[in-house]
Amino acid sequence: MGSLTSVDKSRIRQAFQKALNDYDRHALIQQKMTINLMAHLQDYLPNGSLDSVLELGCGSGMLSSLLQKQISADYWLFNDLCDVQTQLAEKLPQSFDFYCGDAEHFLFLQQFDLIASASAVQWFHQPDAFIAHCKTGLKTNGLLAVATFGEDNLKEVRQITNIGLNYPTLSQWQTWLAKDFELLWCEDFKVILDFDTPLDVLKHLKYTGVTATNQKNWTRKNLNGFIGDYLSAFGMPSGKVRLTYHPLFFIARYSHIENQ
């Protein structure tokens, strides 16, 4: 199965900018992921308010809203590749700063009690380096909370088109975290969605920004081929077609222990 090791960040920004107005209505899996991450994060947050919280790749503000509803912090900083500051201001009850730029190479000018990210790190070119990079932005015992996707995410589309992201496995994330972090919680699972037609699958991906991976222009011939191949490979007895999501989560504490 073909895969993309990386996608140009300008394509990602363009795809998500186009999808911004439709994202919340169609990104139902991503919404459930933020709820799941937040529910488990509550178990590890210290009592009382935090000094500072950073969310990387905040997008339309799904996780941002939950964070601000359930955490009191003296300073909030949100980041995204798209300039979503106006949209965030309409959603968020607490004041915040916003930095527009690439989350993977975020320039840490201070250290945070919590760095959170949902449905963003799968776009990073070097996720292992990102884990190491987060050490510079976390206080000792600071928390890193991430929701992303595992290796079987959107596997049907990847099989038909030979295009898709190269998703790290849960065991890879565990290995990358083991050096400097205490893994507090992790899990992954699969969710099967059904759609009336393969065309509806493509529309769903467009409305959630995933078409950033598509580096070719669809012709009528390509589209008809995709529809036929998808129906034959992933048609269900109901007449609908399936699409797999593979949510993956972890919460880790920066233990600040140097290798002996």
UniProtKB/Swiss-Prot annotation:
Kindly give the InterPro entries that the UniProt entry links to this protein: BioC, Malonyl-ACP_OMT, Methyltransf_25, SAM-dependent_MTases_sf
User: Which reactions appear under catalytic activity for this entry?
Assistant: malonyl-[ACP] + S-adenosyl-L-methionine = malonyl-[ACP] methyl ester + S-adenosyl-L-homocysteine
GO terms for MF = carboxyl-O-methyltransferase activity; malonyl-CoA methyltransferase activity; methyltransferase activity
Cysteine disulfide links: none
From the UniProt record, give one GO term of the biological process aspect: biotin biosynthetic process
Q: In which pathway does it act?
A: Cofactor biosynthesis; biotin biosynthesis
Q: What is its EC number?
A: 2.1.1.197
Instruction: Give one Pfam family.
Output: Methyltransf_25
| Membrane-crossing residue ranges in chain numbering | none
What UniProt keywords are attached to this protein's entry?
A: Biotin biosynthesis, Methyltransferase, S-adenosyl-L-methionine, Transferase
Q: Which NCBIfam families match?
A: BioC
Report the protein's function. Answer: Converts the free carboxyl group of a malonyl-thioester to its methyl ester by transfer of a methyl group from S-adenosyl-L-methionine (SAM). It allows to synthesize pimeloyl-ACP via the fatty acid synthetic pathway.
Q: Which HAMAP family match?
A: BioC (MF_00835)
Regarding protein family, the annotation reads: Belongs to the methyltransferase superfamily.
Q: What is this protein called?
A: Malonyl-[acyl-carrier protein] O-methyltransferase
Source organism of this protein record: Haemophilus influenzae (strain ATCC 51907 / DSM 11121 / KW20 / Rd)
- Identify the coding gene: bioC
